[in-house]
Amino acid sequence: MKTSLSTYQEAADFLAGLIPDMPQTAIILGSGLGALADRLTDATAIPYAAIPHFSRSTATGHKGNLLFGHLGSQSVMAMQGRFHYYEGYSMEQVTFPIRVMALLGVRRLLVSNAAGGINNTFHVGDLMIIRDHINMMPNPLIGPNDERFGPRFPDMTRAYDRDLIRAAEEIALEQGITLRKGVYVGLTGPSYETPAEYAAYGRLGGDAIGMSTVPEVIVARHAGLRVFGMSVITNEGYHFADDFVNDADEVVRAANRTTDVMTRLFTALIERTE
């Protein structure tokens, strides 16, 4: 059964009653990147458990709070943890917050994630601007379409906003930040990819691979939000050593090491595009 508009509206009304001045920019903080939320000033934290119809985040490094505050001089909403298909949630549950954001007037969505490096020029700790994606998950728009959110067949030619990408590249140049740019492959997980899968998705055009982001981006674009995405490369999947083992805690540690740089970049990007 599809979630009704009134269900999304109930969550939106609850949040609007707590936060009178709603931001137009939202950030989704992925694995290990929730620490960026610690940089918010004048922050109000609302646990997901308190928000009507929100799910609970169970993934490593995801604290499960919706934050409202300021990053630099601009007001933002930040999801300190997201929902994943591999947690057993439906695609509607995974993307529920995005439609609530749209009802609250959010116009820009910045998404981040931890990802494995497919491209053999990428290294652990690199930041990759997502210029496009390859979706290997069920599409979250399958089922009856509610035209009040968006069209039946939304265009995905420019899923990631070119002006936001250009602005991020300019900021990185000004601040001496090295950025990569590439295609993110979204898989369901929860098992990490085999070496053969890394090689196969590389041949398809993928540069980095992970278990999130794509469903939220599809629903955000369906609702007309501008999207910017960034991946933190947390392993180098193109040359696994014989004794290499993917480890969720190490993914979080690798992502955490980029928090300072990502915070500077996201702060400047939000201020430049307001």
Model region roles, listed by residue range:
Residues 1-156:
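Metabolite-binding pocket within alpha/beta catalytic cores that recognizes anionic/polar moieties
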Residues 102-105, 202, 221:
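Non-catalytic positions within long, well-ordered alpha-helices that form the structural scaffold/packing
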Residues 107-108, 207, 226:
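Short acidic/polar active-site loop segments enriched in Thr and Asp
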Residues 149-160, 186, 198, 254-267:
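Polyanion-binding loop/helix "lid" in catalytic or ligand-binding cores
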Residues 165, 171-207, 266, 273:
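Active-site/ligand-binding-proximal alpha/beta "capping" segment
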Residues 211-249:
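Zn-dependent metallopeptidase/amidohydrolase metal-coordination segment
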Residues 238-274:
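His/Asp/Glu-rich mid-to-C-terminal helical/loop segments that flank catalytic regions of hydrolases
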